């Protein structure tokens, strides 16, 4: 069969790297069809092309083999051999060495390499060669399709080049295939015409033609059917976008130099895509807008020729595009353009049409007035007609012929220009105004006056119309406007107003305008004119004082001024103005431009100001101080005693003066009660407001009705009241930055002088950054205290005065406790004055802003007072800090003299991160203190704080004694307390703080450098935010963190006084709580909290989240600290000192307690978890010796390193002891750790004791040095891993005592052991077994273990107690382990102990049901003692006394019964002792070997009850009675046990019951015996017989007659003992000694028939070889023969089973006394010499 094309292609590549032609493949398919693969390899390898490919073939002996290997790897797989990840060094070395093995390997190497790669599964290599072969065949097919079937050398080389690029990737194959397609397509090329003329075109061909022909013939079949289409010539003319797209869609490629141009609409061009982007150049055929032109210009091949039609806005917005256009057409000629835009359009220098409209500001139009932009506009529109024009500008605009017909204008110019302008210009204006800079126009004409008066700002200018002009001579004139100026005559200056002038006003508002300056000769400052009816005086003083004197009579030259209402004084260059005795009350006074401290003084005839509601309006404008000189304004009646009750004060009247400060002294305006202030200039009242002033209003409120509605004063106001007496002040300041201070006391008496009717001042700073100070006191018989309102702005408020009254306290930013009225801004509020009253305390609202609030003694300020709140019924400041980050500090104390009432400050932080510090104490009078009225109290003076004096201080009876007392106390002589308080102040008050939103810091306690300790019983709420709350004073506090991650720190308190018992509640968030000293209550709240109680008896409540209690046990006693964990909460609790739970502690969630003391600690949870549905705890010990008692629930206890004592108490516990020697009980442990009455029903525990010599009990562990009354409850189902070390492990109850163990104390008389699982690990001989002082490795008991030590200490039971063992599983370890299934009882050596089991019952029979422990015991390695049910050992000086006395006592005065369970016991490796039921041992000898009979001394419970040699007949009869009695009192029923010896020389004691005993089969896989060579099965006396009543037959498996043996007990009342003959003096016994036994072996019975055990005994009788009746010699001194017989049952129900019968030495065969055992898997047969298999020993078990 011919090789496939793929194989041929692959071989060609492997040896030549070349392709194969179609003709090559045809040869291999025909002529070479019979060539095998091996032959083909040889042909290719020996070809010339292979020698060319691999130069190695030409000189293989001298060539480089490594190079050859490299070439082959590269040729086949494109792999570089230097890449060790692809070609391991080992492989490379292999192939180089392989080439040297044989010359034939040279040529075969490419083939061998590929075969080896395939065998190794190197798929990447195989894939690479496969890809190369596929590409080679693709090349062959492509050329064959084009008609090329035989390759030229060039085509072979071309194929090789393509193949060489291929590797194992798909990408390399695709790239090669693309090259092949391109090569194939180039083989046949036609023009369209040629292709149309060719009848049979090849399957693959190319069309190559001009672009124009391709566009025309795009749909021709010869074009669409071509493999490739080439445009070989550019189009003759520009193409449309459509044609260009046809060209690109048709032509697969363009020949070199072929390009095309585009000429089409702009829309088609911009949407043309590749047709446009690929063009050589692009042109358009239409007009475009600016955006389109911009897009076209973005094309890199656009020819740049375009015309634009668009809006003026778009054209102007893009000058770059617009400037390049050949023409511009405006699409919105009706939309106006700016001057700049019109200038741009005119500057383009290209046709622009149609014309446009200009709209712009007057300034821009005027600037371009004669330019083409304005001249060529169709219309010009001014768009800011509200902007004034000068006269010249208005004329220029009006001269434009294309000005918009609706043009309006306003004019602003100087008076000269306005006067010179055509009247039509002013008449046509909407309005006009003057621009003169000097407001004083001087003397003008009436025409000018008309123009001035027509101006919108006429009121800003002063001018005089020359109606009446005074002369230096006497003028007696009448008129409306009088002008008096200084004139020059003859070179001298004369004032024109003099004493001889008589001026009479006429018309409306007659006015005298007066300019006064120093005269050249005989300057006069005081004149006496007669002014009648002149209502307004405008006086300007120029460096000259003026006094106008009015007498009260009308005489020329004597002065008389009447009718004057308004005075305007101006002192630009200085001068005092004084008007004396005016005969008419003034209405307004204006003082302006007083810069040099000149004064103004007016007096008015007394009758004119005799009323009680006179009003004066005073205006000050630009009245400034000049150094120490301040302008003083004095206005009063002529006598100087009366004046205006109401004063309206305006500071500044024009906006140009805003920012100046008017500084005036208005103290001379007498009798003023109310002052209303408005204006815009700053105002400083340089002297105190007088005592009559009680109202100041700068807000226009209704406080002063006459000024209600006036504008709020916006300047900065400075004013103060000194300490002159007066009424309560209400001061409402304006919106500036004000400085107001009040030193006046609020102390107003009633008309009868009996009552204080004052309440306190009210000071409102209004808006602005104000400094508000009240140093005066406030006294009242009702409600005493000042009110200060900062208003908006950053205010500084200081209150140093005392507030004293029944209700006493200053109020800041409110009028009461409820209604906040201001306080925005960052305020600084300082109150040092005390509040004294029945109810006393200041109230502060901080409002918005970052406020600093201080109440207390401030040593940085020279002020008095301590900021204390001193009350009878209630005392304490109230602070509402408000929004933002505030600071509140209170150093003043709160005190109530009535101990039953409240004392303490209250602070609300509001939003923001606040700092709140209170160092003031919260005090009340001690209940035992005595209040005594001060006999020297002066009720006409303000009272001071009540005076505390010592309890033994006598009350002064004389003024002298009183002054001495004050001096002793360091108080001033005028100290005026209302009462003496004899006693001490008590810390029983409470400050209350609420932090509000924000991260607040709240501190109670001393502040550095401040008075007070912060003592008291405080309450704080952190609210939202991460708050820090701390108490460092003395007292007990309650802190609530609120939302956020808070830190709460309680105080240390004073244990002597009982303080420091804090309540801390973290609320929401992750909080830290520290109680400090005292008995604290800590509750974490929501979130993950950390709580530390500090010293004292603390209570922790974990109500949610994951909380950490850091210092449980740091208390006054072990039960001091307690905690509770809520449902769904988790607590990590660090126990720092010994700790004991009480009923307060419970866990409904997850609680983990960790002992922190490395030296060890104690945790006792026994009293915890009183509520229902509680959960257990996790307790983790430290490296020291820990004592841990669990709860009644399911606990997890980890003792850690150290010698720990652990009791799980109730519940299903998990206990781990870790390293070292531990005492562990799954439930109760008495070391003594736990009172006996606390022992509870036990849980199902999981205990891992870890390494160390541990003592472990699943339920109860007692180790005590005293007598103990033991109370047994039912045991739990425990799992115990004892771990490494010598461990004492008991499944249920373990008791060790240096005293008596009284089992009578059990409340329940039946105790049921749990089904326990116990495992242990390698011990270290660390246990001294209590009998014989034998060192053992581990001691395991399934249910009950009890041991007593000490002289005379006993285990006794006189009341009936039933112990039912559990079904336990116990596994030992290597070493000597003692494992007991149910009960182990021991008394120590030489201590004369008794184990009294009177009325003790092991197991229970209830009807047909037997309850006993069915245990599974595995000894593992080592020589083990394994007992299924009971192990009792007692050592005493008296020996064994059964009936009374010391020793092991059974059944005295009661009934003792043992019921064994059906146990499974496996010895494992080692020489083990296996007992199925009960073992009573008197002595174990050290070193102990369970196979050495000398190491055992077993107890015979019957020994002392049998007759002895030499007994009389009566004694023998009594012995029989005693024995019979014991058999009634002591009953034992063994279980059906399974005993498996395992390896080693094991000893078996099946005991009572039908036991199954596997003594080993001694066979391994290798045929070597692995079980013991000498294994022993024990059989005791009649009551331990294996065939009691024919039903108790043991089954022994694996008996090897060569090695194993039966050991029988010999001696009195035991098997092989013979029979006691009544009346004989000597009881006959077998004369058999250990090691000298002689047995008589009968022939086996091989075909017995038996349906039951009795049938087996009958088989012995029936087939006995001696006769029907066995007879033995029983004479004393002679050895006896004991018959043995093997019985094989061949029929009946027991068919197939084998038995061994042994007679007990009495001739008759008896199922009651003789021995029968079933043998299974017996190895060998018994020989005549039976010594190796049978032995008699003296022992009792």
From Swiss-Prot:
Keywords: Cell wall, Glycoprotein, S-layer, Secreted
Cystine crosslinks: none
Superkingdom to which the source organism belongs: Bacteria
GO molecular function, one term: calcium ion binding
Cellular compartments per GO CC: extracellular region; S-layer
Gene inactivation effect: The deletion mutant has similar pigmentation, but a more flat, spread morphology and a shiny surface. It displays a smooth lipopolysaccharide surface as its most peripheral layer. Viability of the mutant is reduced upon exposure to lysozyme treatment and hypo-osmotic stress.
Annotated spans, Disordered: 894-913
Record-linked Gene3D superfamilies: Serralysin-like metalloprotease, C-terminal
Keyword Secreted: yes
Location in the cell: Secreted, Cell wall, S-layer
Polar residues: bias regions: 894-904
Modification after translation, per record: Glycosylated.
Amino-acid biosynthesis in keyword set: no
Any one Pfam family match given in the protein's UniProt record, by short name: HemolysinCabind
Entry domain remark: Contains GGXGXDXUX nonapeptide motifs, which are found in members of the repeat in toxin (RTX) protein family, and which are implicated in Ca(2+) binding. Binds Ca(2+) and shows Ca(2+)-induced reversible conformational changes.
Primary role: S-layer protein. The S-layer is a paracrystalline mono-layered assembly of proteins which coats the surface of bacteria. Under laboratory conditions, has a supportive but not a critical role in the function of the cyanobacterium. Shows no apparent hemolytic activity against sheep erythrocytes, however, a slight hemolytic activity is detected during the conformational change caused by the rebinding of Ca(2+).
PANTHER family, per the entry: S-LAYER PROTEIN (PTHR38340:SF1)
Protein's name according to its UniProt entry: S-layer protein
Organism: Synechocystis sp. (strain ATCC 27184 / PCC 6803 / Kazusa)
């Amino acid at each position: 069969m011919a090789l496939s094309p793929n194989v041929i292609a692959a071989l060609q590549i492997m040896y030549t790297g070349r392709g194969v032609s179609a003709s090559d493949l045809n040869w291999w398919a025909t002529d070479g069809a019979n060539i095998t693969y091996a032959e083909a390899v040889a042909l290719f390898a020996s070809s010339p092309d292979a020698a060319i490919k691999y130069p190695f073939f030409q000189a293989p002996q001298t060539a480089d083999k490594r190079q050859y290997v490299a070439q082959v790897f590269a040729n086949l797989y494109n792999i570089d051999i230097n890449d060790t990840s692809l070609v391991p060094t080992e492989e490379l070395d292999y192939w180089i060495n392989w080439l040297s093995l044989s010359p034939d390997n040279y040529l075969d190497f490419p083939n061998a390499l590929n075969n080896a790669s395939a065998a190794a599964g190197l798929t990447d290599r195989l894939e690479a060669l496969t890809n190369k072969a596929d590409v080679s065949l693709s090349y062959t097919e492509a050329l064959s399709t084009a008609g090329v079937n035989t390759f030229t050398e060039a085509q072979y080389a071309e194929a090789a080049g393509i193949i060489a690029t291929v590797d194992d990737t798909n990408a390399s194959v695709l790239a090669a295939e693309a090259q092949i397609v391109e090569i194939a397509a180039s083989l046949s090329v036609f023009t369209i015409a040629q292709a149309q003329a060719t009848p049979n075109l090849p399957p693959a061909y190319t069309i190559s033609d001009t672009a124009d022909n391709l566009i025309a013939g795009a749909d021709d079949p010869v074009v669409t059917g071509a493999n490739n289409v080439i445009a070989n010539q550019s189009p003759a003319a520009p193409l449309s976008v459509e044609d260009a797209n046809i060209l690109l869609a048709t032509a697969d490629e363009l020949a070199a130099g072929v390009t095309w141009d585009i000429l089409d609409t702009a829309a088609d061009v911009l949407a043309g895509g590749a047709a446009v982007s690929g063009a050589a150049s692009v042109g358009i055929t239409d007009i475009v807008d600016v955006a389109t032109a911009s897009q076209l210009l973005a094309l890199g091949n656009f020819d740049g020729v375009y015309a634009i039609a668009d809006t003026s806005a778009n054209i102007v917005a893009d000058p770059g595009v617009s400037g390049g256009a050949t023409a511009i057409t405006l699409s919105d000629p009706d939309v106006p353009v700016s001057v700049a835009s019109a200038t741009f359009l005119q500057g383009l220098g290209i046709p622009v049409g149609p014309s446009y409209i200009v709209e712009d500001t007057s300034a821009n139009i005027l600037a371009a007035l004669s330019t083409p932009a304005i001249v060529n506009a169709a219309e010009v529109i001014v768009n800011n007609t509200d902007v004034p024009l000068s006269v010249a500008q208005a004329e220029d605009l009006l001269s434009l012929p294309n000005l918009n017909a609706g043009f309006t204008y306003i004019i602003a110019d100087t008076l000269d220009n306005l006067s010179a302008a055509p009247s039509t210009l002013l008449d046509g204006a909407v309005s006009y105004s003057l621009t003169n800079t000097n407001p004083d126009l001087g003397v003008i004409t009436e025409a000018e006056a008309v123009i001035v008066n027509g101006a919108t700002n006429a009121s800003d200018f002063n001018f005089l119309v020359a109606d009446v002009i005074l002369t230096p001579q006497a003028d007696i004139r009448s008129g409306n406007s009088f002008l008096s100026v200084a004139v020059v005559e003859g070179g001298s200056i004369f004032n024109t107003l003099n004493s001889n002038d008589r001026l009479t006003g006429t018309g409306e508002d007659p006015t005298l305008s007066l300019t006064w300056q120093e005269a050249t000769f005989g300057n006069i400052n005081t004149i006496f004119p007669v002014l009648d009816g002149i209502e307004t005086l405008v006086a300007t003083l120029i460096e000259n004082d003026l006094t106008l004197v009015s007498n009260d009579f009308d005489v020329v030259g004597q002065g008389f001024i009447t009718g004057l209402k308004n005075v305007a004084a101006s002192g630009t260059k200085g001068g005092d103005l004084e008007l004396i005795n005016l005969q008419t009350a003034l209405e307004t006074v204006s003082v302006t431009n007083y810069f040099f401290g000149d004064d103004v003084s007016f007096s008015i005839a007394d009758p004119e100001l005799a009323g009680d509601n006179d009003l004066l309006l005073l205006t000050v404008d630009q009245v400034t101080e000049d150094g120490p000189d301040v302008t003083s304004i004095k206005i009063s009646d002529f006598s100087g005693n009366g004046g205006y009750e109401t004063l309206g004060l305006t500071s500044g009247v024009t906006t140009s003066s805003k920012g100046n400060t008017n500084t005036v002294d208005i103290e001379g305006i007498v009798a003023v009660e109310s002052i209303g202030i408005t204006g815009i200039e700053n105002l400083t009242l340089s002297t105190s407001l007088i005592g009559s002033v009680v109202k100041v209003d700068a807000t226009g409120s209704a406080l002063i009705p006459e000024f209600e509605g006036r504008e709020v004063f916006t300047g900065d106001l400075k004013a103060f009241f000194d300490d002159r007496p007066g009424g309560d002040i209400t001061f409402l300041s304006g919106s500036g930055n004000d400085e107001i201070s009040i030193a006046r006391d609020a102390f107003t008496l009633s008309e009868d002088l009996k009552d204080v009717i004052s309440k306190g001042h009210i000071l409102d700073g209004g808006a602005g950054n104000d400094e508000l100070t009240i140093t005066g006191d406030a006294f009242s018989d009702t409600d005493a205290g000042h009110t200060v309102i900062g208003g908006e702005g950053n205010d500084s408020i200081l209150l140093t005065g005392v507030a004293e009254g029944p209700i006493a306290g200053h109020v800041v930013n409110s009028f009461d406790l409820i209604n906040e009225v201001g306080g925005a801004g960052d305020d600084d509020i300082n109150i040092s004055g005390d509040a004294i009253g029945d109810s006393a305390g200041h109230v502060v609202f901080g409002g918005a802003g970052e406020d600093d609030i201080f109440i207390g003694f401030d040593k940085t300020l020279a002020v008095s007072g301590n900021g204390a709140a001193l009350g009878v019924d209630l005392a304490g400041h109230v602070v509402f800090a408000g929004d933002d980050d505030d600071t509140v500090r209170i150093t003043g104390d709160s005190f109530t003299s009535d101990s039953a009432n409240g004392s303490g400050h209250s602070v609300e932080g509001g939003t923001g991160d606040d700092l709140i510090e209170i160092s003031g104490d919260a005090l009340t009078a001690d209940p035992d203190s005595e209040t005594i009225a001060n006999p020297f109290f002066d009720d006409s003076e303000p009272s001071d704080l009540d005076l505390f004096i010592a309890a033994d201080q006598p009350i002064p009876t004389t003024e002298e004694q009183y002054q001495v007392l004050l001096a002793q106390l360091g108080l001033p002589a005028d100290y005026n307390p209302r009462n003496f308080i004899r006693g001490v102040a008590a810390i029983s008050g409470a400050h209350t703080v609420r932090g509000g939103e924000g991260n607040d810091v709240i501190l109670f306690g001393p502040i550095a450098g401040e008075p007070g300790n912060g003592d008291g019983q405080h309450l704080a709420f952190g609210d939202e935010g991460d708050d820090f709350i701390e108490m460092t004073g003395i007292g007990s506090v309650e802190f609530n963190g609120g939302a956020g991650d808070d830190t709460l720190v309680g105080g240390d308190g004073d244990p002597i006084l009982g303080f420091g018992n804090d309540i801390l509640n973290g609320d929401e968030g992750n909080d830290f709580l520290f109680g400090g000293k005292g008995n604290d209550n800590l509750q974490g709240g929501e979130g993950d909290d950390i709580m530390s109680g500090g010293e004292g008896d603390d209570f922790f409540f974990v109500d949610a989240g994951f909380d950490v209690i850091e210092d449980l046990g740091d208390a006054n006693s072990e039960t001091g600290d307690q905690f509770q964990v809520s449902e769904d909460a988790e607590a990590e609790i660090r126990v720092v000192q010994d700790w004991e739970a009480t009923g307060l502690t419970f866990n409904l969630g997850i609680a983990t307690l960790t002992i922190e003391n490395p030296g060890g600690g104690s945790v006792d949870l026994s009293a915890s978890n009183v509520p229902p549905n509680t959960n257990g705890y996790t307790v983790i010990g430290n490296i020291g010796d820990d004592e841990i008692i669990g709860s009644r629930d399911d606990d997890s206890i980890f003792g850690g390193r150290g010698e720990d004592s652990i009791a799980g108490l109730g519940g299903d516990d998990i206990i781990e002891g870790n390293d070292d020697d531990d005492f562990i009980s799954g439930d109760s442990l008495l070391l003594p750790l736990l009172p006996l009455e606390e022992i509870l029903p036990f849980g199902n525990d999981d205990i891992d004791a870890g390494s160390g010599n541990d003592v472990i009990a699943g339920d109860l562990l007692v180790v005590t040095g005293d007598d103990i009354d033991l109370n047994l409850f039912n045991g739990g189902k425990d799992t115990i891993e004892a771990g490494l070390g010598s461990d004492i492990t008991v499944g249920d109850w373990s008791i060790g005592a240096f005293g008596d163990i009284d089992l009578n104390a059990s409340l329940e008389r039946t105790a049921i052991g749990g089904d326990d699982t116990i495992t242990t690990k390698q011990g270290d001989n660390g246990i001294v077994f209590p009998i014989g002082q034998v060192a053992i490795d581990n001691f395991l008991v399934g249910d009950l273990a009890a041991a007593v030590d000490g002289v005379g200490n006993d285990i006794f039971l006189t009341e009936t107690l039933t112990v039912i063992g559990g079904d336990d599983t116990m596994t030992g370890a290597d070493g000597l382990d003692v494992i007991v299934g149910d009960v182990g009882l021991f008394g120590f050596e030489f201590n004369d102990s008794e184990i009294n089991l009177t009325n003790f019952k092991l197991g229970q029979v209830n009807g047909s049901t037997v309850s006993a422990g069915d245990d599974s015991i595995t000894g593992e390695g080592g020589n083990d003692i394994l007992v299924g049910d009971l192990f009792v050992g007692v050592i005493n000086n008296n020996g064994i006394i059964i009936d009374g006395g010391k020793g092991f006592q059974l059944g005295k005065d009661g009934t003792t019964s043992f019921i064994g369970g059906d146990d499974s016991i496996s010895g494992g490796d080692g020489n083990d002792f296996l007992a199925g039921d009960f073992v009573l041992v008197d002595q174990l000898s050290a070193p102990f070997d369970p196979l050495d009979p000398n190491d055992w001394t077993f107890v015979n419970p019957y020994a002392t009850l049998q007759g002895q040699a030499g007994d009389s007949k009566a004694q023998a009869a009594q012995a029989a009675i005693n024995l019979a009695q014991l058999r009634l009192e002591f009953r034992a029923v063994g279980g059906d046990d399974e005993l498996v010896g395992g390896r080693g020389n094991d000893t078996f004691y099946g005991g009572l019951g039908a036991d199954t005993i596997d003594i080993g089969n001694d066979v391994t896989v290798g045929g070597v015996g692995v079980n013991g060579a000498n294994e022993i099965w024990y059989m005791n006396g009649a009551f331990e017989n294996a065939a009691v009543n024919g039903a108790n037959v043991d089954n022994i498996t694996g008996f090897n007659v060569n090695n194993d043996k039966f050991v029988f007990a010999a001696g009195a009342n035991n098997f092989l003992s013979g029979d006691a003959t009544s009346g004989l003096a000597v009881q006959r016994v077998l004369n058999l000694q250990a090691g000298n036994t002689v047995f008589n072996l009968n022939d086996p019975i091989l075909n017995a028939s038996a349906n039951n055990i009795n049938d087996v005994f009958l088989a012995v009788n029936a087939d006995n070889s001696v006769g029907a009746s066995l007879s033995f010699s029983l004479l004393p001194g002679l050895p006896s023969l004991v018959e043995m017989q093997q019985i094989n049952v061949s029929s009946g129900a027991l068919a197939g089973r084998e038995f061994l019968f042994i007679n007990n030495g009495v001739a008759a065969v008896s199922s009651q006394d003789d021995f029968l055992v079933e043998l299974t898997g017996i190895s060998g047969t018994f020989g005549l010499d039976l010594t190796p298999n049978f032995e008699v020993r003296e022992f009792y078990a």
